[in-house]
Structure formats: C-alpha cells, structure tokens
Swiss-Prot record:
This is Pre-mRNA-processing protein 45. Residues 1-73, 137-164, 220-251, 347-438, 542-621 are annotated as: Disordered. It comes from Mycosarcoma maydis. The keyword Nucleus applies. Keywords: mRNA processing, mRNA splicing, Nucleus, Spliceosome. The gene is PRP45. Belongs to the SNW family.
C-alpha cells in the first residue's frame, strides 16, 4: 500500500529525516504536520539513507539528526549546529519553554487538548471531547465490560484508606494555617526562656588566654510590674502615588510675546481701595476687561428684529383697520337706532296730535258722534269692501278680464288699508288707556314711572325729545361728590358706639318718604280725621281708594252696627285696634286627650253632632 501511494506522490524536494529530541519544536511541528503516511515514508527513507553519511567536504547542507549519524564518533566541526554525540552536554533538566508541539491523531486531526492537558497531576482526568458529554450507557465506542467497570462498589479497605488520606491532608492544611498564630512555648509572656550554650573563642590569643570557653546564656529576670518599654510610634507616611503620565510636548523656552499674551492684569476693584493706591486710568481700564473681547453680532439678530418689526407693523395695521371698521359699524348702527327712535318719536307725536284733534272725549257721546261725522265728511267717500264686492259681482258680466284684475288689486289695497286703520285705532286705544292709567296713577306708581324715565339712555331721551341741554358747560364733574364728608369714619360715628341706626330710614329720599307720608298740600291726617265732618271723611276715602276696595271695606263692624241701630257714630279710639287672643284649643286636641285618658266612650249624640259638623264643613268648603 505504501509503495502504491509513493508511486502517485511526487518526488520530495528535501530529504525528510526523523527528528531527534534536541531539535527545535518547529522542525517537529513540520514533521508531525505531514501526517502518519508521511512519517512512515520518512522512516523508510531514514532506514535506507541513514548509513549513507556524506563524505568530508560535502556536508554543508547535511545535519546530524540521530545518534546513528555520529557512528559512535564525535561531532562534525563543519556542521555549524548544536551537536550532542552520545548525549554528551545535553541539558537533562525540564525544558523551560512554554511552547507545545502540535500533535495529530490517527485521523489527521489536530489535538488541541494538549493545551489543557499540560502540567497535570498523575491520575487527573480532563474531558476535552464531545464524546465525554455522552453518558456511558449511550456510548458505542466502549465495550460492555468497560462500560460497567467504573461502577463497582468500593471495598471497605479502599474507603478507609481514602478517608485517612483525606484526614491527613485536611490536618496538614489546618496546621499550616494555624502555625503563625500559635506562639512557641518559650515565646509566651511570663515563661522562662531555655538556656543556650555558646562556644566562645576569643580573638586575641596572646597571654595564654586564647582557650575556648562554653558560655551559658540565660534570659535576665524581668520585673512583672515594670511598665512596658515599647512605645507606639506613628509610622511615617509612605511615598505618594506616582503622578499620572501627561502626554505633552517637550518643554521649550517661552517667548516674550507669549509672556505678554499670558500676562493677567491685577484685579482692580471699582468699589474698594483699602490701601489707597493711586491706580492709573489705563490700568483700571485694562482690569475692566470689557474691551478685550470683540463683540460679534450675528446677522440673524437683525433679521429677527426686522421680522418682528414687520409683524408688529402688520398687526398694528390690522388692528387699526379692524377698529375703523368697528367704529363705522357702530356709527351706522347708532345712526340706524337713532333714526328708528326718531321715527317712533315722530309717529308718537303725530298720533298724539291726531288723537288730540280727532279723538273723541272720554265722557261726551255727542262729541264722539260729531267727530266721526266730521271725519267722514273730511275724508273722500269710498265704498266699503262688501259693497264693492257686491257691485263687482253684479257687473261681472259686463267687465273684461283686465277690469277683473284691476278690481282684485283694488280689493287687496282696500283690505290692506282697512287693516292699517284697524292697527292705528288699536294703537290709539292703547295710548288713551295708558294716559288714563297715568292720570289715575298714585304717588308711588308715578314715582316709579319718573325713576324709569330718568334711567333712560340719553340717546332714547334725545329721540323722544325728553333730554334737557346742560345750562352750563363748565361743570364737567359730578357735583354730588363734593358734598361728601372726609371718609366713612368722619360722619358715621365712633367705633365704640352701638347706635347703628342714627338716621331715619327715608330721611334723604323724598320720593320714598312720600309712600308712607301724606303730602302737605292735601292736608294732614289730623286735619281730616280729627274733625267730626263725615262729608270730608267720605270724600277723602273716595279719593284715596287706591286698591278699589270701596268705602265699605274701611268701615268698622261696630260702627256699621251703631249706624244701623241709629245710636250714632262709633266711639273714638285712642290707639290702634286691639285684637283678642284665642287661648282656647281650636282643634279640641286637649279635650280629645283628656277624654282618652278618662276612657270616655263616644255616644250616639256625640256621633250625630260630629256628623252635622262634618256636613257643615263640607258645605262651607
């Protein structure tokens, strides 16, 4: 097989000779890299070429590799390599190199497990292959007897030997750790040191005193109460940590310009000068440092300011246009409102003038008929819509279509005119009723009406003609504010006083005081009610009947009875009417409770009385 394989392989370029132990690892690596076939072929070549040693003078490219190359002789001087004939001069100690030789298994794969298997103790196992992870029961490369060989129960002797070996190892570790801690017997305090014998030979041998002597040295006795001589001292601080490395250029000489640039002026304060030094102005300005830096303004600031200015101007223009438009709309609305109010006022004045001239009186019937006749004579005669409708129906056969259309249009105009006249009559009627109510209005209602008229807007007053022009144009302030006191505390009262109501309720308002007081023009109450004149009393009651209750509602019951009986007028009361207080039980609850306590039963008479009372109550309701 080897011959057949060599027949296919090319001729070797170099002669492959076996390596010796003294060769370096590179040559061994090259040899093992070639694989088992190459090693076998090389061994064959060695076996054939080992006896053939080149003659002297032709050994420049030849190297002795094995002990057979020396032929039991010495080294070859012409071969400049390390030679160890008969292993003479070879270092037998362990190699100090940490390089490992590359090894190859039978299949040509490199064995990398040599890295972890180096420097192992005897009996130590390292698992470096994948098959080591497979359980032994599933391994196919192990025989059945080898598979169960490692699972036998150990014997008693093996267990005891392993236990004893483990105990001794643990004791050795423990003693090694405790040895520095446990002191010797002689080093314990209070114990006497053992005596030492020292052979002493003097240096001077003259005068016959050079004989050797043996000296017994013992420890001197120490006083147990003596204070300790050892003093604790502060240990000197160790050297500091080295400075960190700084990567910088080598130092060079500083120029005058650089010194000038690096010159920092002294601090000169603008507020303090405790020493009173006279500081030149240029030094003060140099210390200010305001002019050292050049102020660089970005162009975007100008653009931003310009944009803000344009936006502000545009916004102001929009606001101005909007305000102008609002003013125009407000003026137009105000003008329309004034025009509307002016038209209303004009219409009211015209209607009032028409009512006063053509409206009949309230009480006179003849004047009403006369005014209607005069109104009918003054207006042109026009047929009523019903008469015109009947006439148009009679003449329907004698008219054309155009005449009928004209008649229909005229009818619509007449109807519209009639509706307008009805509306005017209704407005005039309402106006007359309003005037009548105002004429019959009491003082209170009239005061409220006056206040309502005073609270009108000035534009409404101008439109209705009620506004009065100001007599003087100089008074532009409210004169009512000048008659006030200094403050609230000036005229109100002292803070310790309790008289909260220092003035009457309606002392300052004449309109409100008139509600509860009779006007002086109509006479006081004493003038009317103190006298015995019945005519004046009835007249006053008839005039001041505000609520429409009539005079009979104001008369006393006792006075009516006396008047009916003819006994005369009612007795004059000196004070207000006194009402009697009903102290009895109106619902008979107390009587009911007393009856219930006594246990009184209801009789038939009481039931009949209750039935009559219930019937009477239902009839009254």
């Amino acid at each position: 097989m080897s011959a057949t394989l060599q027949s296919f392989l090319p001729a070797p370029k170099y002669s492959a000779l076996p390596h010796s132990r003294d060769d370096d690892e590179n040559d061994e690596y090259d040899n093992t890299e070639a694989g088992p076939s190459t090693s076998s072929s090389s061994s064959a070549l060695v076996s054939t070429s080992s006896p053939s040693i080149p003659p002297y003078g032709q050994r420049a490219a030849w190297r002795p590799r094995t002990q057979a190359d020396y032929a039991n002789g010495g080294a070859y001087p012409e071969c400049h390599v390390a030679q160890y004939p008969l292993d003479m001069g070879r270092n037998r100690s362990a190699a100090t190199s940490n390089k490992l030789a590359m090894r190859i298994d039978g299949e040509g794969n490199k064995r990398y497990d040599a890295i972890v298997k180096q420097s192992l103790r005897p009996g130590q196992t390292v698992q470096t292959e994948f098959k080591d992870l497979v359980p032994l029961s599933q391994r196919t490369d192990i025989k059945e007897k080898d598979r169960n060989s490692g699972f036998e129960r150990p014997s008693h002797e093996e267990v005891m030997s392993n236990t004893e070996r483990t105990r001794l190892a643990l004791e050795a570790i423990t003693k090694g750790k405790n040895k520095p801690v446990v002191p010797k017997a002689g080093n314990l305090p209070g114990q006497q040191q053992a005596a030492q014998f020292i052979r002493y030979t003097p240096a001077q041998q003259g005068a016959g005193n050079g004989t050797q002597r043996i000296i017994k040295m013992t420890e001197a006795q120490r006083d147990p109460l003596e204070p300790p001589r050892h003093r604790f001292k502060k240990t000197a601080a160790g050297p500091p940590s080295p400075p960190p490395p700084v990567l910088r250029s080598p130092p060079r000489k500083v120029t005058a310009q650089e010194q000038k640039d690096w010159m920092i002026p002294p601090a000169v304060s603008n507020w303090k000068n405790n020493k009173g030094y006279t500081i030149p102005l240029d030094k003060r300005l140099a210390a200010d440092a305001s002019g050292i830096q050049d102020v660089v303004i970005n162009d975007n600031f100008a653009q931003f300011a310009e944009a803000l200015h344009l936006a502000d101007r545009h916004a102001r223009e929009e606001v101005r246009q909007r305000s102008i438009m609002q003013q125009k709309l407000a003026a137009k609305e105000k003008a329309a409102k004034e025009e509307h109010l002016r038209n209303l006022a004009q219409r009211a004045r015209e209607e009032r003038a028409g009512v006063s001239s053509a409206t009949p009186s309230v009480l006179g019937r003849d004047d009403d008929v006369a005014s209607r006749l005069a109104d009918s004579d003054a207006r042109p005669t026009r047929a009523t819509p019903r008469a015109e409708g009947g006439m148009s129906a009679m003449l329907a056969g004698y008219r054309s279509d155009s005449d009928s259309d004209e008649s229909a249009a005229s009818d619509e105009e007449d109807d519209e005119g009639a509706r307008e006249r009805d509306r005017i009559r209704e407005e005039r009627r309402r106006e007359r009723q309003r005037e009548l109510r105002m004429s019959n209005m009491g003082i209170e209602q009239r005061t409220k009406q006056l206040l309502r008229e005073q609270n009108r807007d000035i534009s409404e007053k101008v439109a209705l003609g009620l506004a009065k022009p100001t007599a003087s144009k100089e008074s532009m302030t409210d004169s009512r504010l000048f008659n006030q006191g200094e403050s609230l505390a000036a005229g109100y009262g002292d803070e310790d006083s309790y008289n909260l109501y220092d003035k009457p309720l309606f002392s300052g308002s004449s309109a409100a005081a008139a509600i509860y007081r009779r006007p002086a023009a109509r006479g006081g109450a004493n003038d009317i009610y103190s006298g015995a004149d019945d005519t004046a009393l009835e007249e006053e009651l008839g005039k001041n009947d505000r609520f429409g209750l009539g005079q009979s509602k104001f008369r006393g019951v006792q006075g009516d009875a006396d008047r009916d009986s003819g006994s005369g007028s009612a007795p004059v009361r000196s004070g207000p009417v006194q009402f009697e207080k009903d102290t009895s039980d109106p619902f008979a609850i107390n009587q009911f409770l007393e009856d219930a306590k006594r246990g009184i039963k209801r009789t038939s008479d009481q039931d009949a009385d209750d039935a009559r009372k219930k019937l009477r109550d239902e009839h009254d309701s």
